[in-house]
Amino acid sequence: MKVYTRPFQKEVYDKVDGPSKEALIKYLESEGHTIVSKKEDYYADVVTEKDGITFFHEAERKAQWKEEWPTYWEEIRIPGRKRRLVEKYKDQLENLYFYVFNKHYNQAWKINGTQMVDAIIKEATGPTYRIPKGETFYHVPYQEAERVDIV
């Protein structure tokens, strides 16, 4: 499927990028990772090292997710534009992780890069008043992701 992405929304990026990275770094450091880079370079948000292995991490926020994950949201949706990361790190997908944070940045879904396959890229369905027609997402069943707490 052709990946459709909406135009860049600087005001949204400016609002969520800093808090998303801060929450991600807090979680990663609590898991024993050393931060190698958090520089904005259009690739992974945060690069870490743990046990001599380099890892790549990308953060998103789902503002509509406030407290507990509603189980009627059967899928976690990661924008199709993130395919550029899957392509960039295609030889290291087992070391690539995507995180989708809730509104409060105290919980996240963690998804491994190996799960990000073209077969799960689809247009969003359901109430899509915030999503431009045709925008594509990776649709990952929430049962196939790991929920992590940020403390």
What do the PLM-derived regions correspond to, one by one?
Residues 1-42:
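Acidic-basic catalytic patches of nuclease active cores, encompassing PD-(D/E)XK
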Residues 8, 30, 91-151:
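Non-catalytic C-terminal interaction segments of nucleic acid-processing enzymes
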Residues 28, 46-67:
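Conserved catalytic cores of phosphodiester-cleaving nucleases, focusing on short active-site segments
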Residues 33-38, 84-91:
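Short linear motifs in intrinsically disordered
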Residues 38-40, 57-60, 101-102:
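Short His-Asn-centered micro-motif
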Residues 40-44, 105-106:
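Short acidic/glycine-enriched loop/turn segments that link adjacent beta-strands
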Residues 41-43, 52-56, 91-94:
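Short connector loops at helix/strand junctions that flank enzyme active sites
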Residues 62-89:
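Mg2+/Mn2+-dependent nuclease catalytic core
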